[in-house]
From Swiss-Prot:
Its main location: cytoplasm. It is found in: Cytoplasm; Nucleus. The gene is omh6. It is an enzyme of class 2 (transferase). It comes from Schizosaccharomyces pombe (strain 972 / ATCC 24843). It comes from the Eukaryota. The keyword Nucleus applies. This is O-glycoside alpha-1,2-mannosyltransferase homolog 6.
Length: 298
């Protein structure tokens, strides 16, 4: 089964519709693949009716469906471990000392969303949904970000280029390393002591002391069946999620999944023909276009 999937919300309807229109016009009008929408809250009737009108395939809508870890659980756990007085711990992540210290440090590195509990919870929820959501029992999904626009006419069925042995089909993005990424590398070193499976010599697509390159999640095809049914992947991903790094180190879903793919040497291919634009910092235009027809790159 092949699905186009968006993690979105009612508030993002405008961006969702523009993205759907782009994907339908540039690609899906030829293949009519179904769309699946997942959100942390119920979708409104208006959201469902307007999105289903644009889709050339059928639409499915789902919500949480899985239990994700919220920031309060980590507040109480860490508070207990360092012998803080639990009676003094307020149920707000902003009042957690450890969180505040880590967030302040990350803010000094000019990172966004470091004080956003919703952002951290969303990263945790997306990864757990991909692994465990009961409605996501799909072979392959094309993960598309609300707001993304395809800039090339795509005449070939992208799913057909995905080989049985492939795990991920995407683009790469390189970013400056921050203290949270160094913490992830340390966590994986600790995991390495407990587990012998995997090549831990090179976690990222590319890395040096200052930069790391990872798989970009906002326009990628994933073999969910292979990921979900491979305990080696799920064990490492669950270990990283269980460490609380999404809250205390600002790990994103792309950080966690890319690290797992890198350690376990996932077979990956580059989406070289799929040009897209998300924002001024996130875009891609193919250098050679052997079969896509036309592009309108900025």
């Amino acid at each position: 089964m092949y699905f186009l999937i968006l993690f979105s919300s009612n508030a993002e309807l405008g961006e969702v519709l523009r993205t759907m229109r782009s994907v339908e016009d540039r690609f899906n009008k030829r293949f009519h693949y179904p769309w699946t929408f997942y959100g942390m809250d119920e979708f409104t009737e208006y959201f469902m009716s307007t999105t289903s009108t644009i889709a050339s395939g059928h639409c499915e809508y789902g919500t949480k469906g899985i239990t994700y870890t919220n920031h309060l659980q980590f507040i109480l756990t860490i508070s207990y471990l360092v012998h803080w007085d639990l009676s003094q711990v307020k149920p707000l992540v902003e009042n957690n000392r450890l969180y505040q210290q880590r967030a302040d440090a990350l803010a000094q590195e000019n990172l966004s969303y470091v004080y956003s509990p919703l952002f951290h919870s969303f990263q945790d929820w997306v990864v757990r949904s991909l692994l465990y959501h009961p409605q996501l029992e799909y072979d392959y999904v094309w993960r598309i970000e609300p707001g993304l626009k395809l800039v090339c006419e795509e005449k070939k069925d992208i799913f057909s280029t995905f080989k049985d042995s492939d795990i991920v089909f995407t683009n790469h993005v390189c970013e400056r390393k921050h203290s949270g990424i160094y913490a992830m590398e340390e966590a994986i070193e600790e995991y390495k002591i407990l587990n012998t499976q995997g090549d831990f010599s090179n976690i990222w697509v590319y890395s040096n002391n200052y930069t790391y390159c990872k798989y970009w999640p906002f326009n990628e095809i994933l073999s969910l069946k292979q990921i979900r049914h491979n305990q080696t992947y799920t064990n490492l991903i669950n270990y990283l999620l269980g460490s609380g790094g999404t809250y205390y180190h600002r790990w994103t879903e792309s950080d966690i999944l890319s690290a797992a793919f890198g350690v376990l040497r996932a077979r990956a291919n580059h989406m070289e023909s799929v040009g897209f634009f998300l924002n001024d910092d996130v875009h891609y235009c193919p250098e050679t276009i052997p079969y896509t027809g036309r592009c309108a790159c900025l």
